[in-house]
């Protein structure tokens, strides 16, 4: 991003600090950052009070304007500025920091649009989604970088779709963890958060639905209903025994009346259940033979968005796909990798109604749809 530097008599051009990063713009006027501590390695707050007073009295506004002009407007280094202003090089950083404190220099940031609106419009129109956020990612971004970017810029979008006092069902996932962590804090939202899936294993980690449910409830001043069961049990009889418990049954029923669900969309290729030792490669082959293309909350579904008929189906304790379809707003969150088949099937089956996705994934989804 380019810095635009302004003074009272001239518009500041592109400049930086000794080869400064081009991420901010500065102007020689008062502003909200006038009292912020200097980012150039020095701040007056680190000095004793007497030194601060002396320093402020020692430099005139005229000196500060000259130093700021030479440094920010003309792009001179601190050594050259020191010669012009007749001070030591070490004093230049003090001059520049004081210029900010007195309001002679102000920092502003040029607006950045993190979302790809054309792709959003196309996805919404072609796939019939209620709302879409396509987040731009830098070329060559790693999986972790894509997750971080989608979460950072997707969090406000997700928050806008969840009204105060709503019931929110939430699944687990790596991208979901980052997104929940970055949700704007609002203690007055008072949502009821419902864990949409039991714990994957005995080692409850930061990406599991329980931890994310608790984090969301804490950020939004809400209450939490936990599904205190394993996500996967040995057989249908064990599942039914858990669901027969009043405490578990109450949470299960509350899932049915959720206003919003926030879910990740998995594939057989990157299944967290294999990583956690719940499923084997052989299990995935069997699911693939039964037509599985995607997974939400441990529920594997086919190209039509219908749950695959397999022994696995009766071993899962999580929100059912039929329950999910009845929730008014289901937001799918995806970052990195081509999950087009899984996403398209989820949309076709009415499993998700809105989508947060990275730019590359959005393009792949449109190409998959056209083919």
Residue positions per predicted region:
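Conserved beta-strand scaffold positions in the cores of enzyme catalytic domains, especially
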Residues: 132-134, 193, 224-226
